[in-house]
C-alpha cells in the first residue's frame, strides 16, 4: 500500500509493535507512508485529571477507556519507541488540537455559545506551537530497512 492510515487504532491493539512490524514488513510499499494518530497521555486534560486525583498518572488507562478497548495511552516517547521497535522510520511528528478540557466537557460547551470560532482557532494555533500538549499526537512514517 502507498498510504496506510491508523487514526486512534493503535491504542486498541494488544500487541501494537506486532501490527506496526507487519505494516513495515508486509503491507507498506517501498515509498509508502504510514500516518499514525493516537490520544496523547500528556494532553492538558489528562494532566489536570492527575492533579484532581481522577487518574494516577498521565498514561493511565482508565476503566472507561479500557471498556472502550484502549490498552495503552501513548506519549511521543512511547509511540516513537514502538514505531522504531517495528523498524519504521519517522519522518514527521506533530499534534492535533490543544485541548485543556475532557471530552464530556467539550461536548457540553459546544452546545452553548461560550466557545467561539476564534477560541477554536486559538486552540488550533496553540497546538501547532506545542504539539506535545495536543489532545492527539501523530507520526508520519516510512518503511524501514
Summary of predicted features, one role per range:
Residues 5:
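A conserved beta-strand element that flanks and buttresses the S-adenosyl-L-methionine
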Residues 14-26, 33-144:
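S-adenosyl-L-methionine-dependent methyltransferase catalytic module, highlighting the catalytic core
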Residues 8-12:
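A short His-aromatic
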Residues 2:
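Conserved acidic residues
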Amino acid at each position: 500500500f502507498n498510504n496506510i492510515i491508523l487514526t486512534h487504532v493503535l491504542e486498541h491493539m494488544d500487541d501494537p509493535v506486532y501490527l506496526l512490524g507487519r505494516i513495515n514488513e508486509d503491507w507498506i510499499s517501498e515509498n509508502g507512508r504510514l500516518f499514525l494518530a493516537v490520544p496523547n497521555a500528556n494532553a492538558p486534560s489528562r494532566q489536570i485529571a492527575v492533579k484532581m486525583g481522577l487518574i494516577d498518572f498521565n498514561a493511565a488507562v482508565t476503566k472507561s477507556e479500557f471498556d472502550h478497548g484502549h490498552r495503552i495511552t501513548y506519549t511521543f516517547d512511547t509511540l516513537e519507541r514502538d514505531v522504531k521497535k517495528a523498524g519504521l522510520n519517522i519522518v514527521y511528528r506533530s499534534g492535533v488540537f490543544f485541548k485543556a478540557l475532557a471530552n464530556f466537557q467539550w461536548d457540553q460547551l459546544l452546545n452553548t455559545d461560550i466557545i467561539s470560532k476564534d477560541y477554536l482557532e486559538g486552540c488550533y494555533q496553540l497546538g501547532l506551537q506545542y504539539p506535545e500538549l495536543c489532545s492527539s499526537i501523530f507520526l508520519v512514517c516510512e518503511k524501514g530497512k
